[in-house]
Each structure stands twice: as structure tokens, then as C-alpha cells.
């Protein structure tokens, strides 16, 4: 039997370019893994894995459904323990393939940097947002002056908002092992490596591959919001904390190269971080006020700890004695007031001599940081602390003041190069992360605020707020906001829900205001939604009220958003309150689920244009907050392209974007990834402001308006109006079983009963991604384009022109093309054959015909013969992955069949995988099956199913 290694080389015969080592990396990791598999579980299982791979590769070659049946008969003959080992093996091999890709991409980038040569890369020149290249392009091609660039850069802000959306399907224990495999692989191919080093690295590589394979991939309990927050914060520890100053230094260098001899000021807010973990209550009952308080204190403790761990390095560096009189006086004062040794410090524990004034001052900063950390720790553990608040840092200004004093003094004494060393990095960290590491956003559904208001008005006996008209609500809210009297006392009758809203606001009042960012209202529709939150914040005595951000998601809400925001701006009280700044959030996932991708993308585009117009009329600076998912169905896609395809004037130097679940790992999992992410966001935001994309021509708009209606009708006629669609969806995908994956702390439905409306956008997309049919992404496109071309043949050339000249349209089409390249209707047909009742088969066939028709139209408009012909690298990477995914799909479909149909009989062959310990060889299957004793299905089926879900998610790389 040909080894997988040989098969790989057959599958991808030609290198894409000289520096293409992907197949080599992939083959090395697989060889190592298969040897480990054989050592642990015996030769038979290795052969079974190879046989499955071979059948899949044959299927991928000709797409002959018979090959899938052959594959199915191999897979269904495995007993419980064996099918777990096979599922785990394929899932593991896909993870290894992803790692090989990441190392290859990093390698090609490095080569490209060394050659500084041409960019015939998957991210052709338009997408490569290297900050230096962007500066040079702006100066050379667009005639901007270096000063203009510096000025725009200093005043722009990108705020990355980490959300714990339940799409990160890999456990943290595994992510760390993956990181080490990546490092070993990269070092193994370094040029100057000695034979001994090579041998040791190879051993380390095998060790990590085995450790990852021997780790249970399945989360046995759902994570709590605190777990999610700790997982999110671990990226700060590992990459972001050090990555930010490193990135800002690169910006300084790039500025120098275009002739600016200044550094980016440390108080320029280039990059900010926020978080929803522990603040996002929308549909997640597990996020309680208690959780919000814990998460804030934990983040403060982590921030103080990170600063504390660096302050001694700074004390070592600043050993100078020349300083300004002001600093000398401060140092003397501190020196005389503290006369004790500090034995709990490792360095500088003795009394610091007065002739080292910077160290004296930093010593005091260190004491305060120590107290700040300990106070947060005690508050977290016991709810109280014996450290007085005035011995800690409570505001950013307090913390910055002594550091700025040192910086100014060094510069005044001619030691600017020293000031611009570690001290500048430290100042930039302080300015970026503050005392709270990230600012926590609070998100709540608008109905919950309405319930609270209703309880208040009923209690005051002035009627039912719920039944009032919008006008009456506004009038009452404004009269209360202009007045001074408290609205309610402790005698307000409260349900659990109402108490939850009010207790959350009390937490906001109790904790320092720099812990928090925005208060986001989901499903917002009218000005009263915003005013109600303003009033509640005042009633709960939030000293510095959070800015209130309406979130518009559904198609109808997006269309009505500009008018709602205009009404809000026309209220004098509100206009005075916001001080000329407003943030509006637009949701990509729910709009896509509601109307389909094409109409949602166009509605989001138009809503932004109109919102910016409204803000201009009222003299308000608008920040758009983009709630994008990681998948295309939920608005995902390459960062820089997404930003550069936004309508002109909508970015305007300030941008907020959610970074979710698995996207956090792809963007910040490694130092070089973190660096690249920060570059991309900064460069694309700058470029969008200084060189905005073109506005679409009136005839393009008219055409899109017309066909978007057709797309929505087609999408809704199937998803919402087809009477048996929900039944078909639940049968043809693993949607019902998705909840068992324990990915996130949030339930997968808004309301337990009900159809597609109540299903969250994430499981909706996840389920279709599993069967490689991706219905939500493409449904509607074919009908829309077909209608346009049928109506007038000339429309084809109009659409082609739109594709070639208009970034927004091009990005929309390219992303759908990429999803088609990952899709496979033959696999979806297998699920139908096994799982769907026969009278629904014609419906599935109709959808698959739609898939093919839409694919053809997309290729026509893009002017491509084959999918992804403009992107050979991505095409090669997808081809390498397909054969692994196919085995997992077949295994998933047959496992679902066994779970759902008790009468489905399969002929099992004898158990083949051996366990290493011979003493247990009489009950080896039992070992693996025992991991999940509470499963309601036959032994091993649930674990096999979850492993296939995780494997396919790893292969598709855009889970939810």
C-alpha cells in the first residue's frame, strides 16, 4: 500500500513556487505521526488509517460516489474503540496540516522580506498591509506628504474587541502543544543547524506530536464565562503584551524611512483592546453581575502583575544620576519617607541610595503596583482587602505621572536615547493597557431594559411602559433625565431578570470606571432603547456613565438605523450628553441569517453610508463597530480587504472590530501572527482614510438594489417559507448534536423551542460547514445573478466591471468563491442518503443543483475558468486537506446514522487497535469509551461524533 506520504506527492505534483516547502513539511509531520500511531496502537490501525485516506483521495480525484460507499463500509466495520482512534487520528492529522501551513506562510514571508522581491503571493499586493509598504505607497503613488501620514497615524484608533464566541473548538491544552510543534518544525528547516541539534529537535517534535495525540480533545464540561475570559487573557500574557511595544517600534522605523524623525507619541491611541468576556449577557444566563465583577478584578490583578514583572528590568536600566531639579526633589522626598528594607523583593530590596534618583522613584512605583495587585487579589478572594485604596493606583494619571517625570528628566539631561528604550516601551504599554488590561463592554438585549422600565412605571402607578408609544416613552424618559429625583427605591418589586439588570449596573457603579468600555444594546430599534439605558445608569449612580451603543442586526433594523440615529441626534439632551461622538454597532451574523449573505452585505454597506451622512449633518464623529464572525457566513474574511472594501468615509481613523473565538488564535496565537495582525489593522485603517475606495456608480447601485431583493426572496423562500426546511436541516446536518461539543458558555438557542429564527447564528453556520454545503453563504447569489443576466445580457458585463473596479463587490464575490472551493455537494448528498427521509431527497437534490448553478455564475462574473485560479497557494492548501476531511465526513455521517437509527445494523470486525499496556489488552476498547460514561448513545458513538466535528472544523478553518 502506498504511504500517505507518497499519496501527498501524487496529489500535489508541482510546487507552486521555488520557496514552496508545504508538501515537505506536511509529509514530515505525517510520517512522524503515523510511526507514533503504529507504536501506540499497532500496525493494523495504521493500515486502516492509510486505507481510509486512500479511498478519500480516490474520491477527491473523480468525485465518484461509489468511493464514498467503499469508505463507508471500512468505517462502519470499526468497533467503538477503533472508530474513536481513527476519528482522533484524522482530526490530529488535520491539525498538523494546519501547522505545516502556518510554518510555510511564515517561511515565505521571511524569504520575501529578504528578497524584497515581487509579491506573486496568495495575498497579492493589494492585500499585503505591511506598514512600511503602505507608507511608501501613500508617498510614492498617491502623493501624500510624510507629515500628513504622521498626522493621520497619530490620531487614528483601532479597538480590537475580544469576544468569547463559542467557535474556538480546540482546547487550550492542545493549542500550547501545537505552538511547540510549530516552533520545532520551523527550527528543523533553519539553514545553520548542526546534526546534533537536528536530532534533538526531531525528538522534541515527536514528543509534542505524541503529547497532543494523547490529550483528550473533548471538553468534558462546558467552560464558564470566567474560563473564557482567562483563555482570552492568556493571549495578552503570551503575545500581545510584548507585541504592542514591538509593533510600535516598527512603526517608528517605518516613519523614519519616509523621513519623519519623530516617534509615535506614547499617548497616541493607535491600538486599544476591549473584551466582551464576562460582559456579554445577550442570551447567556451564565454571565451574572458576580461574573462581571470577578472578571474586572481578575483583569486588574493580571495587569498589575504584568507591570510588576517588568518594573525591575526598568530599575536596572535607569541607573543614571543626572536628573532635573524637579525629579531630584521628588526622589529626596520619597527617600526620606521610606526607611525600611523590602525583603519580599528579589532585586533592589535594600534601601536604594539617593544618588540613584530614577531607581528611588521607580521603587515607589513598584510598591504601589505590588499593593494594587494584592488588593485586587484580596478583593477577588474575600470581597474585602486590608490594603488601603490610597496605597494603590486607582487612575491611569497617577500611574503615568512618575513615569512621565522620569521620561522628561532623561530627555532634559541629554539622555533621550535612553528614555526611548525600555522606558518608552513601558509607557506605551501603560497607555495601551491601562490599569485594567482591557476595557470590558457590557451587552444586553433591549427587551430586558424595557422590562425594567415597565416595572418602574407600574410601581409608580403611571401606566405600563411596554404599552406606551415611542413618542410617549421618549417624553417620559427625557423629563426624568432632566429632573433630579430618584425614580425608585429598594421597594421596587423585582423579578430575577430585573434584579440581574440592576445589579449589573450597581457593579458598574462600584468598580473603577476605567474597567469599562461601551454599553451595547442588542436588537436596538429606537431612540428610547438608548435613553432608557442612560436613565438606568443615572439611577444606579454610575459616576462616569458608559457610552451607549445601539446594535443593529436584522435587515429591517439596518434599513431603519439611519432614521433612528437621526431622531436620537435631534434630541438636545442627548446631543449635549455625547459631546460630539457616537458609536454604532452593526451585526454581520444575524443579518446574514435573516436575509442571506448578498442582501446582508449590501444592506450593511448602505446603512454605513447613510449613518455617516446623518452624523455629518449633526456634526457628530461616528465610529462604526463591526460585529464580524470568523466565517464568511458571519461576515468574516481577510482583515485588510474587509477594511479596504468599506464605503468611503466610514472608517475615518477610528474603527472597532470584534475578534472572535477561533479568530483570536489565528490572529494572536504566535508572536509573528500578533505582529502581523496589528500591522494589518493599522495599515488598512490608515490607507482607507488617506486613499478611500471608490464610490459605486449609480447604475451599479441600481442593479444591486434590484438583485438584492431577488436574493432575499430566494433565501427566505427556502429557509423560512419552505414548510419542511427546518426538518430537512435538522436531519441533514449535525445541528441537534452540536450542543454536546461544550465549545462555549452560551446556549446555542435564544429560546429553547422554535425554528431557524431562534437558533443562534453560530450553530446555524457550524452545522452547514460540517456537511461542506455552506448553504447560508451562497444561497440567493445564483437567483440574483441569474435574474440580472436573463433580464438583460448586458448585465453580465456590468457585473464583471463591478467585480474588477469596486473593492466591496470584489471582496463579496471572492469570499463566496473561496467557500465554493471548500464545499462539496457530493459529501452533502451522502448525508442526505443516510440521514434524510426519502420524500425529502428531491428537496436536497434541488439545493445541490442550485449550488452548481450559483458556482457557475460566480466564476463567470469573476472571469475565472476554475475556482481559485488567481490563488494557487490557497488551492494547493485546500487540496491537501480535502482527503482528510472526506474521511471525517463519511465517519460523521455514518455515526449520525448509528446514533439516530436504532435499527441500523452494521457488521463489526474484531477490535484492531492495541493499547500499549498489554495487561489491559483484553479490554482495550473499553479504555477509550470510559472517558464518556454518561453518554446516552451506544458506547463510543458520541465521542466519535464530537471528534469528527472538531476535525472538520479544523479542516474548514472557519467553524462558526
Curated annotation (Swiss-Prot):
Keywords: Allosteric enzyme, Carbon dioxide fixation, Cytoplasm, Lyase, Magnesium, Photosynthesis. It holds the Pfam family PEPcase. It is found in: Cytoplasm. It catalyses: oxaloacetate + phosphate = phosphoenolpyruvate + hydrogencarbonate. GO terms for molecular function: phosphoenolpyruvate carboxylase activity. The active site is at residues 165, 593. The keyword Repressor does not apply. Its cofactor is Mg(2+). Its EC number is 4.1.1.31. One of its GO terms (biological process) is photosynthesis. It comes from the Eukaryota. Its main location: cytoplasm. Pathway: Photosynthesis; C3 acid pathway. GO terms for cellular component: apoplast; chloroplast; cytosol. It is an enzyme of class 4 (lyase). The keyword Mitochondrion does not apply. Signal peptide: none annotated. Belongs to the PEPCase type 1 family. Homotetramer. Through the carboxylation of phosphoenolpyruvate (PEP) it forms oxaloacetate, a four-carbon dicarboxylic acid source for the tricarboxylic acid cycle. This is Phosphoenolpyruvate carboxylase 2. The lineage of its organism: Eukaryota, Viridiplantae, Streptophyta, Embryophyta, Tracheophyta.
